[in-house]
Amino acid sequence: MAGSNDVAKVMKTLDGMREGLIQTAVELGSIEAPTGREGAAGDYVYEWMARNGFGPERVGVFDDRFNVVGRLRGTGGGASLSFNSHLDTIMAREDTARFADANDRIYHEAWHEEGRIYGYSVVNCKGPMACWLIAAKALKEAGAALKGDVVLTAVCGEIDCEPVDEFQGHDYLAEDIGARYAISHGAISDYALVAEATNFKPAWVEAGKVFLKVTVFAGPSRYTPYVPRPVAALDSPNAIVRMAKLVEALEEWADNYEKRYTREYGGGTVVPKVAIGAIRGGVPYKIYRFPELCSIYMDIRLNPDTNPLVVQREVEAVVSKLGLKAEVKPFLFRRGYEAQGIEPLQNALEVAHREVVGRPTERPGSPECSMWRDTNPYNELGIPSLTYGCGGGAGGGNTYFLVDDMLKAAKVYAMTAMDLCNRTP
């Protein structure tokens, strides 16, 4: 652990950086960066790190979609710690197929008002990023003694965008070019703290996922005046009508699936949820002939112990029970992980949390352990990782952070680094 004088000096330095924290979070959160278009946000972080002496590098597959990696160098002999958050956000202004209010400013802007910083992009995930950027700046400016390096990692492509059908290439890649790419190309450390919203509750297990495309076949297609009636929905020549019955059956299966596959782990509880995220059938400007095929796209979360093929076969069994002609095809699989050897980071974080927040940490909620977070690529590659940050998640509807909580998070991050990076690896 760093000396008490170092800790006090860093905490005092952070108290003086409150306005800088607000400015960084608002500026970064105001940059439009939907998945596929993170370049401007990456440039901001690169320039910020360069200006503050962290020697950043652009590490990425594409010139306009890259990860930013900076370092606060230690003197040697101590454990290294990565901080990680993502640059991309959930919403583009043209995303009207998913959101009725896609142009609402809450998705595209950030602002400070009465001790709160508003904006989806702040909550997910540029607010936590601002916290560890400011924490690193305070460590540097206060001259804190660190033996191990602090690795600052701002990544692209964390949000669940995946190539499928004609949607291929640059704009549709996500996790393959984000944290995992950065780690594989040099952003390595002994431990990693993924800064995201967890209500100050650390979690070190995350779900995996399998995405399935399920296509129902019917036919023959007929001109509207020749539509046969009456006919049972499962016998309809219209694939959309048949799909309606399958969706109903899959929703019933999904409820049962999450109950059967819920698992308790040391790092949290995984409750694997299922969502039907998209449907394609017919041509909107040629509706006079109903479609002979209709597809849905399923997002199925997996606990770390579940084989995706088992889940695929369960979905196929639902289809078979209805007597439908259909194809069930996986187009994405990513495994979930529970951290191994996390105790040194967990213990350092616990000490820092108690000092700053004033109480022991609590067990995380299941949503924080049942989604994708970039703890997974770290844990996959053997770098023990947990996620921890202030406030509730944007996926659950939260739209702001308290500045006081963000400052607390920055202090916890700084104290954790001062402890862990002065331990022997």
UniProtKB/Swiss-Prot annotation:
Cofactor binding summary note: Divalent metal cations. Co(2+), Mn(2+), Zn(2+), Fe(2+) or Ni(2+).
SUPFAM superfamilies to which the protein is assigned, alphabetical: Zn-dependent exopeptidases
Swiss-Prot/TrEMBL catalytic activity: 5-nitroanthranilate + H2O + H(+) = 5-nitrosalicylate + NH4(+)
Annotated InterPro entries: Peptidase_M20, Peptidase_M20_dimer, Peptidase_M20A
Temperature dependence: Optimum temperature is degrees Celsius.
UniProt keyword annotations, A-Z: Hydrolase, Metal-binding
Cofactor needs: Co(2+); Mn(2+); Zn(2+); Fe(2+)
Record bears the keyword Lipid metabolism: no
Keyword tRNA processing included in the entry's annotation: no
Broad EC category: hydrolase
Active site residues according to the UniProt entry: 88, 158
One of the record's GO molecular function terms: hydrolase activity
Signal peptide: none
UniProt-listed CDD domains: M20_PAAh_like
Functional pH dependence: Optimum pH is 7.2.
Listed EC numbers: 3.5.99.8
Function field: Catalyzes the deamination of 5-nitroanthranilate (5NAA) to 5-nitrosalicylate (5NSA), the first step in biodegradation of 5-nitroanthranilate.
Family indicated by similarity: Belongs to the peptidase M20A family.
Protein name: 5-nitroanthranilic acid aminohydrolase
Organism: Bradyrhizobium sp
Gene from which this protein is expressed: naaA
